[in-house]
Design a protein with these regions (language model features):
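Conserved donor-nucleotide/metal-binding helix-loop-beta segment in metal-dependent transferases, i.e.
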Residues: 78-111
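Short glycine- and hydrophobic/aromatic-rich loop-to-beta-strand nucleating segment
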Residues: 107, 112-116, 120-121
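Short aromatic/hydrophobic "clamp" motif used to bind/position activated sugar donors
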Residues: 69
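Catalytic core and acceptor-binding pocket of nucleotide-sugar-dependent glycosyltransferases
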Residues: 57, 121-249
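The conserved acidic donor/metal-binding loop of glycosyltransferases
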Residues: 73-77
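Conserved hydrophobic/aromatic beta-strand scaffold that supports enzyme active sites
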Residues: 58, 99-101, 113-115, 195
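N-terminal anchoring/stem segment of glycosyltransferases
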Residues: 1-66, 241-244, 248
Length: 249
């Protein structure tokens, strides 16, 4: 049996409180399936850079300790606890490749969820080179932009990376390429999917509200209401109590 770890990273007291539904889902998922779980915070944050860049160093810290590592951004919640990584995600990574990511619902390469082969010298070197792309420090996509640049520029890197275009398998969104939850051309989250990544939702308490709502609906086996999500996106709540007040239905 491969040794598998789930990794995530979350910084800031208020942000951690807002992301707690997602963080709790990952802790539970790891415990349910016997995976190790590592949650990084201020202890691994490189304060000379925007927070997302610390992803690389945090993953490198555990790279040699496991056979496989599944990275999940803090703004994601696991909704189907029954799907095992061994059955649902691992088969998507070919034996000759060391990194799996997705081409997302907004038609971009996305590193919000990654499957990495442990002990890979190439992964370590790739992340080191991505970390060195300092002209991208304040790019809107931060570390993701660095990974995309190397992927597109270097055939050797492209040869080690598997791109999953069935993004919903492990990186489902609720908003598509038109920035709406009613995006007819995009495959968005459906009940039974593994998880939701709330990429593009920038207000922490809005993410909290959407995570909590999605979890409620998943337990009931019900779909999400696109009109409600779109209304919420344009009117973020100012606090946890304000978010909770809109969930009483």
């Amino acid at each position: 049996m491969p040794r598998i770890a789930i990794l995530t990273f979350c910084v800031g007291a208020d942000y951690k409180k807002a992301m707690e539904p997602g963080l709790a889902s990952k802790r539970a998922y790891a415990a349910n399936h016997g995976y190790a779980f590592h949650e990084g915070g201020e202890d691994v944050w490189d304060r000379a850079r925007p927070i997302p860049w610390s992803k690389f160093k945090f993953i490198e810290k555990y790279l040699d300790d496991y056979d496989l590592l599944f990275w999940s951004d803090a703004d994601a919640i696991i909704l189907n606890q029954d799907l095992r990584l061994e059955d649902h995600v691992l088969p998507l990574l070919p034996a000759d490749k060391d990194l799996l990511w997705s081409f997302d619902a907004c038609n971009h390469y996305n590193n919000g969820h990654l499957l990495l082969r442990g002990k890979s010298a190439w992964v370590r070197d790739y992340f080191r080179r991505a970390y060195e792309q300092t002209d991208l420090l304040y790019h809107i996509w931060w570390d993701n932009a660095a990974m995309i640049r190397l992927f597109e520029a270097n055939p050797a890197d492209k040869g080690k990376i598997e791109t999953c275009r069935d993004h919903w398998l492990f990186n489902a969104y609720v908003f598509g390429s038109n920035n709406k939850a009613t995006s007819p051309s995009d495959r968005l989250y459906k009940p039974g999917d593994f998880l939701i990544h709330f990429a593009g939702v920038y207000d922490p308490w809005n993410i909290y509200r959407m995570m909590t709502y999605a979890s409620q609906q998943a337990r009931k086996g019900k779909p999400l209401d696109p009109a409600l999500l779109e209304a919420w996106r344009t009117a973020p709540p100012p606090s946890k109590s304000a978010a909770d007040a809109t969930l009483n239905f």
